[in-house]
Every structure is written in C-alpha cells, then in structure tokens.
Amino acid sequence: ERWGFCLSQEQFDTLENGSYKVIIKSTLFDGELNYGELLIKGKSDKEIFLSTYICHPSMANNELSGPTVVTFLAKWLQEINETDFSYRIIFIPETIGSITYLSKNYKDMKNKIFAGFNVSCVGDDRAYSYLPSRNGKTISDMIAKHVLKWIDPNFIKYSWLDRGSDERQYCAPGIDLPIASILRTKYGRYPEYHTSLDNLENVVTPKGLDGGYWAIRKAIEAIERNKKYK
C-alpha cells in the first residue's frame, strides 16, 4: 500500500537531512463519506448537472468559491416558477466524492444528464477560463464558449490535457458525461494556489464571485432557452 502524511512548513523546516524510520499507527475500516445532494424538478426529466467540492475549506478560491457560487445558483433556480429541465446539484469531497457518487448513480446520470458544469475557482477577478469536456463538442462546451465570448472575448481556452478536478471522473472513458468547466483563473495557474495566501485578501473578491456566478447562470439560461420551434 502507498502511504504519506502532511506537516506544516515550520515542522518540515526543523527536520535535518537524512533517512527516517516512520511508524504510522492507522487502521482500515468501513467508514462513511458524506455529501450534499439537491434535485430540483423541472418540466423534463432531462438534467443539468452542477458539481462542486467541499474538502479543503482553508483555501478561498480553490475551494470556497465553488460552493458559494453553486449555493446562490441553487437558490436562484428554486425561486424560478418552473424550469424546463431538472437540476442535479452536488457538494462532494473532490475526486473520491465524485467517484463515490458515480458508483451509486452512474446509470441514472447517464440516462438523464445532457449538460453540466464542474464549478471550481470562480472567485477571483483576474481572468475567465474554459476547460472542455473530454469530447469537447457537447452542448456544455458550446454554451460555455458562447457565453464567455460575450463576457470576455479574451477568455483563456484550455485543453482536456489541462484537466485536474472532478471533470477527470465525469468525463473518464466509459463514463463520458457532458461536463465542462467555466472558471475565473484556473486552479494551478495563479501563484497563491494551494497556499495560505489563497484568501479573501489576496485572491477572492466580491466582483470576482459575482462574475463567476453570472457566467454560469448565463450558461444555464442559454441552455434553458436553446429550443427548436416547429
């Protein structure tokens, strides 16, 4: 089995160079994994999927911006009289949470989800970014690029090779859900990423969160209005 542990920089700095023997006192046992799920019923059983993660809340943009924006999107959707499509919204631990959720719900998700977004890093005001699904040609991809083109013509386009969040699981071979990402500055592309400086003073701003919220809201509105009239 593989193992490892975390320690603070101050603790690390006290260690001298050399070899260490490590004793890890741990056990393997059946536990539990908790996640939040909200299903909003629309006229159709076809679903738009929103996923965000809740596993490392000390970081403002890389973590808290997603749940914050998704919470307000859920509030807005529940205030609408009735949407054309249904909505599946989940708050999960990153990676293991999406794997767990897929293991329990994959068949239902595959039958119902036709569009969706993984919501991460939507709180800064430095850029707008787009990360495609593995397919790159889903309605989620087309809508994301269309919306961002009008918000910021200079938005950053990443490739599927730049993936690093739960889109890895949702778009994995054999799963292939139509999930893209609309972000502000992408994870790993700002200097405060995965440090204590990813906070409300240095990275996340009210304007940044508002921009992240409206980018995804406009994408949802575009999907709702995307109809063929006879």
Residue ranges of each PLM-predicted region?
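N-terminal hydrophobic/helix-forming segments and targeting peptides
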Residues: E1-K230
